[in-house]
Amino acid sequence: MMAALGASEVIAQLESAAKVLMAPPSMVNNEQRQHAEHVFLSFRKSKSPFAVCKHILETSKVDYVLFQAATAIMEAVVREWILLEKSSIESLRTFLLTYVLQRPNLQKYVREQILLAVAVIVKRGSLDKSIDCKSIFHEVSQLISSCNPTMQTLACSILTALLIEFSSSSKTSNIGLSMEFHGSCKRVFQDEDLRRIFMLTIEVLQEFSRRENLNAQMSSVFQRYLALANQVLSWNFLPPNLGRHYIAMFESSQNVMLKPTESWRETLLNSRVMELFFTVHRKIREDSDMAQDSLQCLAQLASLHGPIFPDERSQVDYLAHFIEGLLSTINGIEIEDSEAVGISNIISNLITVFPRNILTAIPSDLFSSFVNCLTHLTCSFGRSAALEEVLDKDDMVYMEAYDKLLESWLTLVQDDQHFHKGFFTQHAVQVFNSYIQCHLAAPDGTRNLTANGVASREEEEINEIQEDDRDLFSDQLASVGMLGRIASDHCIPLLTSLLEERVTRLHGQLQRHQQQLLASPGADSIDNKVLDDLYEDIHWLILVTGYLLADDTQGETPLIPSEIMEYSIKQSTEVDINTTLQILGSPGEKASSIPGCNRTDSVIRLVSAVLRASEVESRATRADLTHLLSPQMGKDIVWFLKRWTKTYLLVDEKLYDQISLPFNTAFGADTEGCHWIIGYLLEKVISNLSVWSSEQELANETVQLLVTLVERRERANLVIQCENWWNLAKQFAQRSPPLNFLSSSVQRTLMKALVLGGFAHMDSDTKQQYWTEVLQPLQQRFLNVINQENFQQICQEEEVKQEITATLEALCGIAEATQIDNVAILFNFLMDFLTNCIGLMEVYKNNPETVNLIIEVFVEVAHKQICYLGESKAMNLYEACLTLLQVYSKNNLGRKRIDVTAEEDQYQDLLLIMELLTNLLSKEFIDFSDTDEVFRPHEPGQATNRPVSAADVVLYGVNIVLPLMSQDLLKFPSLCNQYYKLITFICEIFPEKIPLLPEDLFKSLMYSLELGMTSMSSEVSQLCLEALTPLAEQCAKAQDTDSPLLAAMRHFLKLVFDMLVLQKHNTEMTTAAGEAFYTLVCLNQAEYAELVETLLSSQQDPLIYQRLADAFNKLTASSTPPTLDRKQKMSFLKSLEEFMGNVGGLLCVK
């Protein structure tokens, strides 16, 4: 369309379209706006628009049109690169650069876009060496030395454009070239040109740093070059020979450390460069924007590592020099808010990047000064962070800086190889004390005090906390806990005295209130402020205690930290074991009132202080003072007890070289202390579930503590000896209050705990009695409900629905309790229910919550048990799952979803069904069952001879689900991704099953792959492309010339061919598309040749015809026909990269 018009008509049309796009929404309608957008799109896709674009740039006065002309040049240069003469490209680049130089008043966004076009031309030319940066650098150098701020700013813009374009494939222009192409350009650029840019930048910074007074214009130039230096020092240097798969991963790393090549040695190891950046920072530190850049430059220099250092000596010299510069910059000054994060990043980088042996090799007095400075800053930033919280600031700069410094401490103190024991103790004491002080109320602490020491505002109630402090501050607490360990001598007694004192005060407050109530019922004169302060103090003291005494362990065996064990052993000669046990076993008494209390084990006394808090809470509930208690404190206590139980209770001597006698006596196997604690903890659980049943989070933490008590067989053996345990089991089985008021998720976990307890060691009669009391009532009540003659009439009554829901939740809990040694009993028990659950699907088909929960039962059973089941049991489960899916499909197929809620309900169901099918599929590669041996004692019978695999079941399941997958449902990203992951998974693992599918299912599956490839997100498209390779390979193996799969693969060859050659696609997909394309070409060589021939014969332009023909010949240049050989495939993929660089986008023009 544009090609037929003269230049002046084109300009008129573009300016008119720009006017529409720039007009306010009230002045133009949608249709006009879309037409205007189409005009620009059409213009940018026009063939060889260079002459008309130059004319536009020279004559048009409309900025937006100038911007579009620059964009059109940039896109066309890349698209038509192989058609252009090198001299034309060079003159185009010169024209653009000259254009900008001659028009200093161009709008910023127009100038940046023209310079981006220059950068793209330079980048595209860098690989075939047709264009280099030398002449540009010469011009830039002249602009810099002109001393004209406008010209210097322009020079900076040119360098910035080059830097952005070459820096990474994520920031680069979307010019349709591969990751490998961007990587190659970047490597060429970073060795020479990047260093030149840095040297030019350093020149400017040196000149400006020498000047006394800078006017606003000069400050602006200075700031731009400082930002440019920051960009260079933050360059993510690409290592040599990094494959395309890793380039994206490498470049996505957030915190880039400075790791330049050897060629930078002379530049960056020059001490004057480092000194310059310290000088610059001192000069501009009060300007918060510039300070950010100067500190970031220093942080990057603090992370310098890699081949740039020739030996250790050079590293030591560099580090010592840097620390001297840092200390002289920050000692004796008041740090600005805007500096806090930057300074903490510098320190963090020094500690993280430089190896310990280098850190310890610098002069010892310098290292001591550095650690003292770190201590001072940590305490200072901690106080400022506490202040930020009080003032509820949005931008928590000190909190971020404090977190960074605490992480640095963690890195330092965990190294006992280079620093002798006790090296950091005094520093740890200071940081620990400061942390505790900031978290306690006045007068002992400074919590909620503003800078001038005034209490800020009425404390919000502790239980109103939006996000739990444990989650919010877990990293901080872990660091402070570790510092507390290395200074155990100081920190454990400190925590004990603070906690004991506050728990005693809390007890006193509650007692006074009780007496007031007895004296005058109805009067309520308690001071809530005092209570709130006490609760908040106890909250923080318990959190720190929990992190100091034990680690977070996910899936590992938790061990008592070595520092705590050593501390207890060191003390043990002066410890009276009996007094220690007396304090542990008397939570109702003040520790200080017990004779000889000072000769107790300090760690056990600290644990006793938490038990004392727990006891005060329990007594208050018995005295009807629950309304005065803090659920948050209840949560903290249970969290601590769970964390502590995992690590200390029934301590396993085999795991330790040496063990503390007090620990062994108090918490070891077969000890009175251990029996007492388990009884106490169980009592606490039962009390909490009764008192706090309405506090969901607290009840949840409580049942998690119960699971911890029984998940290890040794502990469970002691738990089941408690009468309370049996009472709890009976009470729950009878659904009597208050347990029946617990939320469904809490009931589910409680069921899990009760089932785990049932596998403790007991004689067969006792075990039989236990299952009779725990599982049988569940089965009995369930059957009583569903077998009533009028069940269909009463099934929707609230009471009945609650009974059904409670049973389904309990079944999920039973499944969650599965272990290899209990799976036989649990599977047989659950299978009886699964059949009945399928019947419930019919009854409750209009009740989405119940349907969802029924599917969830199946998901849990498959997830937890399938890997242990032998063939016959697996078949039973497969059949039950398939029946479930058939019933679900029958009830939902063709059903009209009237509202959004109904659609979301089905989305939830299908997401669970996908999970169920994926769990079943896992049987094919995670199978712990050799035979059905584990089941024989429980159910005699032979496995069937049908060799049905999980894949058959899953494919049948997909057949049932596929018709339910509407286009609307696939708009839910998580469901769409889960669905395509599942079918790709099936194609990759069982390609041989696909040709054997029923015709309808086969067609649906192929349609799904095509839909995913052409109409879904790039992630889904990639999954579908990955599914094609194994399917094509399966065809090649089968050598069946007449199969529907082969016909489908021919169709996909055309789709992938079009995607690669004719359509603009995401370059990240080129690899997956290339691999699929190669396999499809191997399989359909004649069809591929036909596609190429058809494409070539449709070309009218002889130049494009020839270039395309050459590119295709080069792509399949091998004299031997392509085969499914890895080496040949890799060679093809490399040629495809080049092919895409030369012709990608060439055919996408209008």
From Swiss-Prot:
Does Plastid appear among the keywords?
no
**UniProtKB keywords:** Cytoplasm, Nucleus, Protein transport, Transport
Has keyword Iron-sulfur? no
List, in alphabetical order, the GO biological process terms annotated in this UniProt record: protein export from nucleus
- State any GO CC term: cytoplasm
Q: Which InterPro entries match?
A: ARM-like, ARM-type_fold, XPO4/7-like
Its transmembrane ranges are none
According to the UniProt entry, its GO molecular function terms are:
nuclear export signal receptor activity
Give compartment(s): Cytoplasm; Nucleus
What the protein does comes down to: Mediates the nuclear export of proteins (cargos) with broad substrate specificity.
Instruction: Give the protein name, as stated in the record.
Output: Exportin-4
The lineage is: Eukaryota, Metazoa, Chordata, Craniata, Vertebrata
